[in-house]
């Protein structure tokens, strides 16, 4: 063995026990290209609407944005391997479905003179994860309201049908823990299917899968060493976010040793022409998970966040919340400049959509802006549109004939003002509200949510009949007659009401 390599190996083993990993290679291995930089652009791939969820403005999150400041550091060439992100199904996402439990209720209230009010309500029925699979399910297209049952001079006669039905929904799987990640889950994650969502009557279920233990392809990059302490502080490769190594440690996963980086990625690094495998002290715990599972402030030691871009995003977020509206330009501020699995956002038909999808580095955009070439590829491909049209893409990309890319458009002297077009944001609807019913006449049907006592839910349908009788004298005579001669009006016990309730009301 080369005496130099033997010396470095001893140095690494000794220093790692005390100070963390240190490196002091020979001068001949210093890189001529130590600077790391962001790609021209990033864009999601394989991210259809089924992998997205509607979110409110407060749920938007600005991405981490890192600088390439390397003062006081020396870069050395290295080969970096990462655990392949995926599972035995061959995708970072898991196909699944929402299971809904909803009561479809038709209520009839009949007045003395025959006037009727027909109300149609969707009532949440609490669904526990253990119930999933016990009952047969149907599809949303098979839902319908039962026919009204009306009784003369009687309020609130209910006719109920309870449905268990499914709607398609894909979520991101954590390849390390096999957990599931989605903004609809409580705390945004779930360890095992079936998973409870924010809505009491909606549960998600999907395939469990097994961990993917294959090693990803080798990529060329650099490790950065502090000139004074000789500590290894980070590793970089074009087309990837930087890996912080200030708190790095060794952990065993899938039967192999890995470096757990500051934010939880598992990687392996070779340097000195592949002769030496970078190693750190053993981790004090066995925590593994998707990027960001560890301390969010770990990168602040060296990989300083680009404050200007971060502040622009925070200002955009504040404006979206304050105005309850969004423009393509404002939404572009939420695009992560680093490839990999990232939060992605799109705007469509009054709603903001969020998902976690793979984004790729883009080296070149065609002159007509209709296609792009991703890093380490030669073919140009079209932009992905999650909603099947050519107008709306991710992070503000929009346009029919010539796509408008706000992040690039802002540098053009005569920029397209369409990126400033405002879209008012609607409230996020309940996922179980399916405007599907068996009525042929939908005139005057409205939808409302009942959170408390509502006068509109009472039976006022006899007023049109009274107005046709000729005025106040007849009304007074009628009241006197009812008071003196009629028996007490029968009443029906009110059925227990779940909250919230959605009403589709039509007055007859």
Swiss-Prot record:
Name this polypeptide is given: Glycoprotein
Post-translational modification: Glycosylated by host. Glycosylation is crucial for glycoprotein export at the cell surface.
Family listed: Belongs to the novirhabdovirus glycoprotein family.
Signal peptide start-end: 1-20
Function text: Attaches the virus to host cellular receptor, inducing endocytosis of the virion. In the endosome, the acidic pH induces conformational changes in the glycoprotein trimer, which trigger fusion between virus and cell membrane.
Organism: Hirame rhabdovirus (strain Korea/CA 9703/1997) (HIRRV)
Assembly information from the UniProt record: Homotrimer. Interacts with matrix protein.
Membrane-crossing segments per the record: 462-482
GO biological process, one term: virion attachment to host cell
Intravirion membrane side: 483-508
SUPFAM superfamilies named in the record: Viral glycoprotein ectodomain-like
Virion surface topological intervals: 21-461
Membrane topology type: Single-pass type I membrane protein
This protein's record includes keyword Coiled coil: no
Entry keyword set: Glycoprotein, Host-virus interaction, Membrane, Signal, Transmembrane, Transmembrane helix, Viral attachment to host cell, Viral envelope protein, Virion, Virus entry into host cell
GO cellular component, one term: viral envelope
Domain of life: Viruses
Record's subcellular location: Virion membrane
């Amino acid at each position: 063995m080369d005496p130099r390599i033997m010396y470095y190996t001893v140095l690494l083993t000794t220093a790692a026990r005390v100070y963390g990993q240190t490196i002091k290679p020979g001068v001949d291995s210093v890189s001529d290209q130590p600077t790391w930089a962001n790609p021209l652009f990033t864009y999601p791939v394989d991210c259809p609407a089924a992998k997205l969820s509607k979110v409110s403005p407060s749920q938007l999150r600005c991405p981490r944005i890192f600088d390439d400041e390397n003062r006081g550091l020396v870069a050395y060439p290295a080969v970096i391997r990462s655990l392949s992100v995926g599972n035995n199904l061959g995708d970072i996402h898991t196909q699944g479905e929402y299971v809904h439990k909803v009561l479809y209720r038709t209520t009839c209230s009949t007045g003395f003179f025959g006037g009727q009010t027909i109300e149609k309500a969707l009532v949440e029925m609490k669904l526990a994860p253990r119930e999933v699979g016990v009952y047969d399910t149907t599809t949303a297209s098979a839902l319908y309201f039962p026919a009204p049952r009306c009784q003369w001079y009687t309020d609130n006669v209910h006719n109920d049908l309870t449905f268990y039905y499914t709607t398609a929904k894909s979520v991101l799987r954590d390849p390390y823990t096999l957990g599931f990640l989605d903004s609809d889950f409580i705390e945004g994650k779930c360890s095992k299917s079936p998973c409870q969502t924010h809505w009491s009557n909606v549960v998600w279920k999907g395939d469990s899968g097994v961990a993917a233990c294959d090693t990803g392809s080798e990529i060329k990059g650099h490790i950065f060493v502090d000139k004074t302490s000789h500590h290894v502080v980070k590793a970089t490769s074009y087309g990837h976010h930087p890996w912080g190594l200030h708190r790095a440690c060794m952990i065993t996963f899938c039967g192999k040793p890995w470096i757990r980086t500051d934010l939880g990625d598992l990687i392996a690094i070779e340097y000195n022409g592949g002769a030496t495998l970078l190693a750190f002290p053993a981790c004090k715990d066995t925590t593994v998970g998707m990027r960001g599972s560890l301390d969010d402030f770990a990168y602040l030691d060296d990989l300083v966040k680009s404050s200007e871009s971060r502040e622009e995003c925070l200002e955009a977020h504040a404006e979206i919340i304050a105005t309850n509206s969004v423009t393509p330009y404002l939404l572009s501020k939420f695009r992560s400049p680093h490839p990999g699995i990232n939060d992605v956002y799109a705007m469509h038909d009054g709603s903001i959509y969020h998902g976690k999808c793979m984004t790729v580095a883009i080296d070149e955009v065609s002159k007509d802006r209709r296609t792009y070439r991703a890093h380490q590829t030669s073919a140009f491909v079209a932009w992905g549109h999650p909603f099947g049209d050519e107008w709306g893409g991710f992070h503000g990309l929009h346009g029919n004939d010539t796509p408008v890319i706000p992040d690039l458009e802002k540098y053009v002297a005569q920029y397209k003002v369409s990126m400033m077009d405002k879209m008012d944001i609607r409230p996020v609807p309940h996922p179980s509200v399916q405007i599907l019913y068996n009525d042929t006449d939908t005139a005057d049907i409205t939808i409302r949510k009942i959170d408390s006592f509502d006068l509109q839910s009472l039976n006022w349908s006899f007023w049109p009949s009274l107005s046709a009788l000729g005025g106040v004298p007849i009304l007074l005579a009628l009241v006197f007659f009812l008071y003196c001669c009629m028996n007490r009006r029968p009443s029906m016990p009110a059925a227990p009401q779940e909250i919230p309730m959605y009403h589709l009301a039509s007055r007859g």
